[in-house]
Amino acid sequence: EESDSEGNNFIYKRRQNGSGAHIGGITAELKLGIPDIFDVQLGYTFQKSQYVEPEQWSDDIEAQRTMFRAPDHYGYLNSNFYITKQLRASLFGTYTGRMLVQHAAHTDIMGVEHPDTEVVTPSFWDFGVKFGYTFRLSDTLRLELNAGVKNIFDSYQRDIDMGAGRDSAYIYGPALPRTYFVGIKLSM
């Protein structure tokens, strides 16, 4: 914390690049299908992300090599099932494994002060489903009506900070709650 000549106080938070990192892992992907019946694509990644030297981001927390916001496990699924020539069902989603995140000192909505901490997040399954029906308007023009649900399991961060003293960078997990949608697609 510093003060200027007029007595105004300023708090500076400074970050600098670390000593380097070692990141390694393996990814497996699979794609299969039968034309006009179904297609499925899925992938899984296992990785390890560590700093070369232990990093310390807070005087209250012991230095460590584990990288923040870098899950060791994650995966995805994209699939389509062609029920009829016009009707298609899609299942899609992602898996994000547990990860270590920083939770900076903050004051909650009750006025209670909390010190810097590190949190291991839960894992998240973020799946959705979509149904689409295509109308053939002419030899070259198609109209698709679709509807679905994103984040079916309503996976989200349960410990979100609130209030003026919150740690606004303490965000993890799926960006949207369970969301229903409808759409129209015109293609040639």
Stretches with model-predicted labels:
Residues E1-R15, I61-A63, G111-H114, R166-I171:
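Surface-exposed loop/turn segments flanking beta-strands in extracellular/periplasmic regions
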Residues E6-A105, Y156:
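Gram-negative outer-membrane beta-barrel transporters
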